[in-house]
Amino acid sequence: MGDPAPARQSDFIFLVALRDPAGIFELVEVVGNGTYGQVYKGRHVKTGQLAAIKVMDVTEDEEEEIKQEINMLKKYSHHRNIATYYGAFIKKSPPGNDDQLWLVMEFCGAGSVTDLVKNTKGNALKEDCIAYICREILRGLAHLHAHKVIHRDIKGQNVLLTENAEVKLVDFGVSAQLDRTVGRRNTFIGTPYWMAPEVIACDENPDATYDYRSDIWSLGITAIEMAEGAPPLCDMHPMRALFLIPRNPPPRLKSKKWSKKFTDFIDTCLIKTYLSRPPTEQLLKFPFIRDQPTERQVRIQLKDHIDRSRKKRGEKEETEYEYSGSEEEDDSHGEEGEPSSIMNVPGESTLRREFLRLQQENKSNSEALKQQQQLQQQQQRDPEAHIKHLLHQRQRRIEEQKEERRRVEEQQRREREQRKLQEKEQQRRLEDMQALRREEERRQAEREQEYKRKQLEEQRQSERLQRQLQQEHAYLNSQKQQQQQQQQQQQQQQQQILPGDRKPLYHYGRGINPADKPAWAREVEERARMNKQQNSPLAKTKPSSAGPEPPIPQASPSPPGPLSQTPPMQRPVEPQEGPHKSLVAHRVPLKPYAAPVPRSQSLQDQPTRNLAAFPASHDPDPAAVPTPTATPSARGAVIRQNSDPTSEGPGPSPNPPSWVRPDNEAPPKVPQRTSSIATALNTSGAGGSRPAQAVRARPRSNSAWQIYLQRRAERGTPKPPGPPAQPPGPPNTSSNPDLRRSDPGWERSDSVLPASHGHLPQAGSLERNRNRVGASTKLDSSPVLSPGNKAKPEDHRSRPGRPADFVLLKERTLDEAPKPPKKAMDYSSSSEEVESSEDEEEEGDGEPSEGSRDTPGGRSDGDTDSVSTMVVHDVEEVSGTQPSYGGGTMVVQRTPEEERSLLLADSNGYTNLPDVVQPSHSPTENSQGQSPPTKDGGGDYQSRGLVKAPGKSSFTMFVDLGIYQPGGSGDTIPITALVGGEGGRLDQLQFDVRKGSVVNVNPTNTRAHSETPEIRKYKKRFNSEILCAALWGVNLLVGTENGLMLLDRSGQGKVYGLIGRRRFQQMDVLEGLNLLITISGKRNKLRVYYLSWLRNKILHNDPEVEKKQGWTTVGDMEGCGHYRVVKYERIKFLVIALKNSVEVYAWAPKPYHKFMAFKSFADLPHRPLLVDLTVEEGQRLKVIYGSSAGFHAVDVDSGNSYDIYIPVHIQSQITPHAIVFLPNTDGMEMLLCYEDEGVYVNTYGRIIKDVVLQWGEMPTSVAYICSNQIMGWGEKAIEIRSVETGHLDGVFMHKRAQRLKFLCERNDKVFFASVRSGGSSQVYFMTLNRNCIMNW
């Protein structure tokens, strides 16, 4: 390569062709992309001289093209205006991979003409420079055309400049040799903006041809590029440019500053009829080309300009120049969105310095050539001196080569050391991060251990308190039995059946010496005496006016007992509440339309005949129905007696108070609701389900009454008709909070309460009225079903949020006639919602619900409730297709051990809750300023695992039973869960647990094949309104009024702020293009953000990305109202609705890599509010847009606008919701949704179906989802309908009116947001599951 003659260099390289390039050439960096491979800057190893190396994979498909390119280069590159071909090499690859072909060509260090123009002030070259470059291009083309070769890709990027301002043509990848007989080509290859009209016509018309004069057109476009900085139509999408070039008149220079010779030259080159276009020989004689200053003068001027532009480019860019091919690459494989395609390689600055050094060596080499010529002349005069000189030169070259090798080795050694240092630094950072992670894990484990230890201590403390309570209750039971015996003997109202063989558990009677009694017994008697004084008839007749009772101090002479030894901080401190917050929860009247009990009325207000609704227990005597024991509800409500239990007499007072309902008074019925009549969901529970487990009960000891009944049953003696109702205690708070515990020693029998012979109120009404009914029950013992009336347990799969041992037992009402199913599409959503089943804290109201007022505040010493009860109303499936609406009732009870095990499961982070929010160990501040004891118990749903699976009870699901028949593998899902009013509270520890939140974004669904849609929500509250969202991988980008955030669904649910103080109205993620398309900012501009830039704002792992601008605008549009990304085959269109126009953009792949203008439609008759694009039958493009008047269409080719559908029956303006193109209609038919209607029309405005889709209410959002269905979000319900028929497939009723907004959907997940009145928002998502709700 040391020989300057190109032919001899080519021969030398050709002799060693197909050798491995190792040791001969090495690659430095990527400088561009050719047609069939990447172009590198390379270096000759021995001399250090630079070369351009094109690296191509040798495949069978491209073998012919590569051979053609090699032949072209070998034959026709020996011209001063064509880059010289040096040779070819084959780099072997491992087996299974393609070998690499290296084509080595002359390196042009000054870059391309396009680079030169971009680095010139004003993006325009001087006319003299343009004339010189055009002349050199014409000379190169004349050489090619003389050999019947068409270049076919003349443009600024393929015209390179050397250091000495020589002009070289490159990229023969699309060159073709003309056939000797035909002389014309009909293939379609080239770059759109520089392409001649006859070449474009070849794609549209197979009979069209062109010849070498197509290069003349490209030369004229390149001249305009040098004069104006860019070719004509460069802002248009390449496809649009291909359409316009043959149809538009030839382009002209915009400015008038250019000379007439230059203007005439361009007009001559850009003659549309190629047969009239002059050949290269004639153009070389054109005045603009011929009448030029001397070549030396122009080259000096151009060389100075190149040097200046290189300095500027060195400051701005990191590469010397860029080769670029004419390919349009596929953008489906994660392209980077940054405009530069230059790779960053280690040691880049070192390479740049080395490049400058090598360029200086090139200059010295040129001087050495002159010296060599002088030496040749001396050789003829003095041969001997010449030989000596040659030896000297040889020795010097050897020394220089050694020095060069030493420098290269030193440089490689420094690079290796630098890499090692970097690797060590990375390893050290990784070790530090791992150490920090381990330390954090250790601290977390310690915190968890400390938490568990404290929890166990408090549990032990609660167990001690429970043992004390057992002792107290045992003593109180004995006192009660004695009082009952005395009163029965005095009044003689009932038969004197005294249990002679029954002994009380404790025998501290009144005859015993008080000194012999223990301290706690004397204390209890003292309290009983004082409470008995308060139980006078006067006090009973005014329960609502009774104020809080001051605490009774213990007797001073009494020695400290077990109660007094309890630490003060561990004793329950309950606030005294007013009369309107009664301390006693009330019985759920399971009798049809039983009267709701006021909150201020105690349990004994209801006569015992209310129990007639329950079937008889296992006792053979059906008249003897034992009074139920105190059974708290599933929400932990504990029914406590506020007075001393010894004051409870055996029968009612002879003069009952006026507020006790007479026995003959008919109970008032619950008013029938006339709206929100919900149809029931029935599915079978046969296949794939596991056997139902019995509801567990852990009785510790029987109560005295139960012992008496059992012994009488064993002896066969008759039993009394039942204990009479007990007189009520005062409604105020007891003086001793420790006495407010239900007796843990009494029997807790788990039983199923069947429905009565009437009709229960509907599930939705019961759910909404649960606070008025007072769902917390107080039962002395749960009635046990007789063998004939026992409900059959039904198999079911365990659901999230329901422990595995909880089973729903359903009872069909035998006397009830089956009702026909009510069509779901006829539902009414206009009912007034009184109460919400969600906790008020989550609803943001800041006030406890009425159910929570039934208890005197929360406890701080642990939950010692004997039993927790959950009442669930469900429907029964009947054989055939006729469902029964008789209500079945399940009473689920839990013992304290179960409560503690469930609490431990929650606190240990088990993912058994159906909501995505799990309890956390890190306490946070109380929301809404509530104190911990008065937090509403809606959160206990979550902390106790009682969250309703579909939507945490904030949505109730209904479907049309006529549509979905019961499947063989589905489980029966309860329509709603009626959980008793908030009685007791969890202890302070559990409250702290559920204050924080750890988001489990991929909760494990324990149901094997769930076919029921579920609604869940994320705990995170956004302070501003959520306007839009888009899925980025599995994570969710959320756009609000105040910025852009990322919700990490793959991790712990953390929210990362990406962009602040900017409004985001609409967004879409195009991951394959590395883009996020948005309408954002105050002016509603269409901005495109690079995902790699957003990713770096979270990871901060690429400093180079941080320096770049992370977004760009599409055009200069402001006031964008809506856009739509439409993918057709491999083309991505972007349709944008502006104030009075619609713009159509299309994605242009590399080298453009941006959305470019395709078509514009201005001055539309209606302002577009909603826009979409369709391709009719794969041929015709039409823009469909909705306005306040109706729906309209614009033909893209002709620009004609016409109306599609105008709802003339609506006089006012309408709100268009969605344009849905029906599947399998070739883009011709669509569903247009507006207001609360939807019509089926085709793109020509013809009604295709005499069906009008009618929503149940005015939706705020309408969206088409993957399951070929359409969803509407209203304030009262979410409706799901078939997109092809408009038939209602399902409804999710809200528990309260709220504004919902569709965000995005993918596969079987639909994301939407709820917006509160204060502007705060939360994200919900609905999982449609595998079958997309088609198998409900």
Curated annotation (Swiss-Prot):
Composition bias type Acidic residues, residue spans: 317-333, 832-848
Residue segments, region Mediates interaction with RAP2A: 870-1336
Protein kinase domain segment(s): 25-289
Keyword Phosphoprotein on entry: yes
Post-translational modification: Autophosphorylated.
Alphabetized SMART domains for the sequence: CNH (SM00036), S_TKc (SM00220)
GO function terms (MF aspect): ATP binding; protein serine kinase activity; protein serine/threonine kinase activity
InterPro entries xrefs: CNH_dom (IPR001180), Kinase-like_dom_sf (IPR011009), Prot_kinase_dom (IPR000719), Protein_kinase_ATP_BS (IPR017441), Ser/Thr_kinase_AS (IPR008271), STE20_Ser-Thr_kinase (IPR051700)
Biased composition annotated in UniProt, kind: Low complexity: 371-380, 479-496, 622-632
EC number: 2.7.11.1
Cofactor: Mg(2+)
Keywords: ATP-binding, Cell projection, Cytoplasm, Kinase, Methylation, Nucleotide-binding, Phosphoprotein, Serine/threonine-protein kinase, Synapse, Transferase
UniProt-listed Gene3D superfamilies: Phosphorylase Kinase, domain 1, Transferase(Phosphotransferase) domain 1
Reaction catalysis annotation: L-seryl-[protein] + ATP = O-phospho-L-seryl-[protein] + ADP + H(+); L-threonyl-[protein] + ATP = O-phospho-L-threonyl-[protein] + ADP + H(+)
Pro residues bias: start-end ranges: 548-562, 718-731
Subcellular location field: Cytoplasm; Postsynaptic density; Cell projection, Axon; Cell projection, Dendrite
Family: Belongs to the protein kinase superfamily. STE Ser/Thr protein kinase family. STE20 subfamily.
Subunit record text: Interacts with RAP2A and NCK1. Interacts with TANC1.
Protein name as annotated: Misshapen-like kinase 1
Gene that this sequence comes from: Mink1
